[in-house]
Amino acid sequence: MKKQLNKITPRNIDFSQWYTDIVLNTKLASYGPVKGTMIFRPYGYRIWELIQKYLDEEFKKVNVDNVYFPLLIPESLFNKEKDHIDGFSPEIATVTRVGQKQLEENLFIRPTSEVLMMDYFSNEINSYRDLPLIYNQWCNVMRWEKTTRPFLRTSEFLWQEGHTVHSSYNEAENFCLKILNIYEKFAKEILLLPVICGKKTEKEKFAGAKDTYTIESLMFDGQALQCGTSHFFADNFTKVYDIKFQNKENKLEHAYSTSWGVSTRLIGALIMTHSDDNGLVLPSKISPIQVQIIQIKNTEQIDQVVEIIKDKLSDYRIDVDNSDKSFGFKISEAEIKGIPIRIEIGPRDLENNQITISRRDQQENKIKVDYKDIKSVVDQMIKDYDLALYNNALENRKNRTFKANTIEEYIEILKQNQGFVLVPFCGRVECEQDIKTKTLTNSRCIPFDQKEVKAKCFNCKKDTCLQVIFARAY
């Protein structure tokens, strides 16, 4: 296994290769036979299952129902919403024939399901009593990407997409923000990602949306990653798909809709935020294995102690390695998998009723404890471990957050650093396109937690009160 660990390129030499090495060497995923696709291996898929579990529980608290809609969308249906089709047309995969028979109408493989859901809702909704409809589906989607990387940007990926219809503008907008709060809490408390919440600019908002809200995270290398979005459509989609309901005054009125989603790119965010040159470093709540027990020898006494420890730590996901692999191999395997807590049990320690325990982020800091006290020790170590991961990520973000007031200052920062740059920005699409042309960066969000300050746009010098985060992004 040490030989396997040597395959991981150091982070400070080539971050991109380091990331790829982590994905492949930790057996999270493999490349698929079609360019841009990937195979989820068991360990990687278990992380996704835990993401699903946590989010599904939160969704159900706000009355979300799970459904499943078809993979294929008729072209005529998709074409109803011009902004939507324009936003996705370069990425859409199309089915044109079955066997040798040409289809009468092209079928799009879903890049997202707004149009399918809206078409369905138009037939289901008649009265205000039918509302709200709050649906979510866990599924795959396809967007034919030019440049792909496992988890971060693949032509086919897994995600959840929620779609809702409401009887009032305010109710829809509030629900959209409620979902964003769920994403923020999940990112911070489960994934230990110190995300920033905000609204997308006009240029970066979702095609067809009135407003797009986002959680943005900064990776270890200083590039941004969009971790989740919630879109408020107002009545943009419901007018196109003629979704009307009879209100309490018995008048017909267009409904209001939202959509929201996170994807398997969250796994990419975990890797690039927390991991190191020795492999994965996983937050405890999302780690498939939280505690790894390594038996140095297989004896009856050690087997008995292992069972006692497993019973005491029954609240945790535990794996016992009692294989005939070498001790060094077992240690390295636990390390590369990013398992938060490692317990080593050998005959010498047991003479004093002791075991050796360590944290993944502090490999050399091993302590010996009485195995009878293992529950309280692990409880505290897990808390300290998770807090350290979050604080390290937050410190990295603080150290890589800058301010600029002019395009010249902005370009100078980019020459020396990667990170979030807060700038006064006018918000115009044309201005942002000019910035992207000049710098290959774009806006990440208009943060919620900002005071209104009059200033000049850092690029075009027009008056503005907006402070916007710009960065290079995955």
Curated annotation (Swiss-Prot):
Q: Where in the cell is it found?
A: Cytoplasm
Q: What is known of its domains?
A: Consists of three domains: the N-terminal catalytic domain, the anticodon-binding domain and the C-terminal extension.
For this entry, list what GO says about its biological process: prolyl-tRNA aminoacylation
Q: Can you tell me which family this protein belongs to?
A: Belongs to the class-II aminoacyl-tRNA synthetase family. ProS type 3 subfamily.
Q: Which Pfam families does this entry report, sorted A to Z?
A: HGTP_anticodon (PF03129), ProRS-C_1 (PF09180), tRNA-synt_2b (PF00587)
Catalytic activity annotated for this protein? tRNA(Pro) + L-proline + ATP = L-prolyl-tRNA(Pro) + AMP + diphosphate
| Species, as recorded | Mycoplasma capricolum subsp. capricolum (strain California kid / ATCC 27343 / NCTC 10154)
Task: Tell me its EC number(s), please.
Answer: 6.1.1.15
Q: What is its main location?
A: cytoplasm
How does the annotation summarize its subunit structure? Homodimer.
Question: Which HAMAP family does the protein's record reference?
Answer: Pro_tRNA_synth_type3
Please give the PANTHER family that the UniProt record associates with this protein.
BIFUNCTIONAL GLUTAMATE_PROLINE--TRNA LIGASE, PROLYL-TRNA SYNTHETASE
- What domain of life is recorded for the organism? Bacteria
Q: Does the keyword Cytoplasm apply?
A: yes
For this protein, the record's InterPro entries field holds: aa-tRNA-synt_IIb, aa-tRNA-synth_II, aa-tRNA-synth_II/BPL/LPL, Anticodon-bd, Anticodon-bd_dom_sf, Pro-tRNA-ligase_IIa, Pro-tRNA-ligase_IIa_arc-type, Pro-tRNA_ligase_II_C
Task: Give the record's keywords alphabetically.
Answer: Aminoacyl-tRNA synthetase, ATP-binding, Cytoplasm, Ligase, Nucleotide-binding, Protein biosynthesis
Q: What is this protein called?
A: Proline--tRNA ligase
PROSITE patterns assigned to the protein according to its UniProt record, in alphabetical order = AA_TRNA_LIGASE_II
| UniProt-recorded Gene Ontology molecular function terms | ATP binding; proline-tRNA ligase activity
This chain is encoded by the gene named: proS
Q: Name one GO cellular component term.
A: aminoacyl-tRNA synthetase multienzyme complex
> Which principal EC class is assigned to this enzyme?
ligase
* Keyword check for Nucleotide-binding: yes
Its biological purpose is as follows: Catalyzes the attachment of proline to tRNA(Pro) in a two-step reaction: proline is first activated by ATP to form Pro-AMP and then transferred to the acceptor end of tRNA(Pro).
